[in-house]
């Protein structure tokens, strides 16, 4: 099984690449979706957020007010660290279970779409690591257009993350998403060919069929050894 890491920066276009993988038939584990699930009303993640930030971050129906919580953590680095620390175990567990379900289905290649791939050290479990990159001016412009925020707000949100240029330097594959959608799709095809190459022996060993084969061969070997000893 090949675990492909996919990350980028806010408004870099990572979701576009993630959707292209899905459209190509490659399963994607989306950490943002996992994160939303682990903070639903009544969950352990929800309880930790309420304990740390109070009822001010709740909507009338008791769900987390994501916009309000975002305003708080993007303007205060310490509170952002608190939030990440509280939710990291829940999100990691959620990602693990999504991977396990796909492993049981026999999927050979799985993309992990994780905004905090480097921050959570999950890049160590993925190869290749793909970073979707744009220059800062484009990133600010797209973020302002998408979210209707001011330039200052856009810069604050960008600065709240690891520098995209640093992520780029750590990547195995970089997708420059500064151009048009058609240009990005063309670049994606090369990336798709790369991640769809035959699995290495280590990756085959991690796959469902590979592990099954190892267990069966080991069991047969043990039985034969016991027979020879009798």
Curated annotation (Swiss-Prot):
User: What does the entry give for GO biological process?
Assistant: coenzyme A biosynthetic process
Q: Which Pfam families match?
A: CoaE
Note the superkingdom of the native organism: Eukaryota
Positions bound to ATP: 8-15
Q: Does the keyword Lipid metabolism apply?
A: no
Entry keyword set: ATP-binding, Coenzyme A biosynthesis, Kinase, Nucleotide-binding, Transferase
Metabolic or biological pathway: Cofactor biosynthesis; coenzyme A biosynthesis; CoA from (R)-pantothenate: step 5/5
Q: What is this protein called?
A: Dephospho-CoA kinase
């Amino acid at each position: 099984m090949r675990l492909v890491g996919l990350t980028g920066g806010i408004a870099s276009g990572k979701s576009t690449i993630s959707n292209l993988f899905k459209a190509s038939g490659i399963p994607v584990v989306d950490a943002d979706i996992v994160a939303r699930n682990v903070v639903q009303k009544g969950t352990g993640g929800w309880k930790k957020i309420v304990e740390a930030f109070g009822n001010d971050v709740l909507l009338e129906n008791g769900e987390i007010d994501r916009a309000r919580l975002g305003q708080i953590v993007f303007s205060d680095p310490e509170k952002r660290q608190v939030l990440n620390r509280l939710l990291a175990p829940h999100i990691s567990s959620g990602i693990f279970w999504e991977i396990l379900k796909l492993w049981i289905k026999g999927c050979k290649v799985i993309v992990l779409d994780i905004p905090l791939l480097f921050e959570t050290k999950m890049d160590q479990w993925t190869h290749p690591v793909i970073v979707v990159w744009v220059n800062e001016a484009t990133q600010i412009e797209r973020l302002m257009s998408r979210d209707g925020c001011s330039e200052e707000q856009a810069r604050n949100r960008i600065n709240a993350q690891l520098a995209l240029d640093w992520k780029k330097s750590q990547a195995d594959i970089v997708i420059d998403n500064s151009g048009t959608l058609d240009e990005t799709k063309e670049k994606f095809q090369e990336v798709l060919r790369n991640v769809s190459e035959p699995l290495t022996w280590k990756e085959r060993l991690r796959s469902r069929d590979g592990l099954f084969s190892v267990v069966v061969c080991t069991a047969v070997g043990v039985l034969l050894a016991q027979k020879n000893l009798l």
